[in-house]
Amino acid sequence: YKNKNYILSNEKNIDTTKIDPKLYNRFKKILKSFKIQKKILEFAKNYEKKFSNKKILGVHFRGSDQKTGALHPFPPDFKQIIKITKKINDKIKFDYIFLVTEEKIYLKKYLNVFGKKLIYLNCFRSDKDIFEGYPRKNHRYLLGFETIVNMILLSKVNYLIHSDSNLSAMARHYSKKNLKRL
């Protein structure tokens, strides 16, 4: 474990700015070696047509288990995230706001504020921990499928508002452009 090629984590998100650059480059090579199933890529590409020639603000607003899980960074509250979304949208005038959240109430509130400007993937959302129980057949597989699709779509936006999460970190890594983070 004392080898510099390992990163010991206490299960918090890793601050990639503190990783030795050589090690970080290896990490990026490993990420590039991952292959995403063709059906997931096709699903994301089909949805991505809504992004075509549009200025998109991506918002990844965690809820669910991140609010209660041990050692998870605590997410911003709704007032904080909506305030920054409004501020950035008023300044840059986006065509759409692409919201990724697993909380039913967050989606409902965003729809109330942004209406038809809001776009989102029709996927599982809950008012509880999304990992509690199995409300649909193949629930865990479908959560993974939807998460990867959302990650791919977030990687295609022009600007990204997010709290600390692995999904937003992977969207930044997966993005082929210099994704502007807010």
State what each model feature region is.
Residues 1-94:
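Secretory-pathway luminal glycosyltransferase catalytic domains
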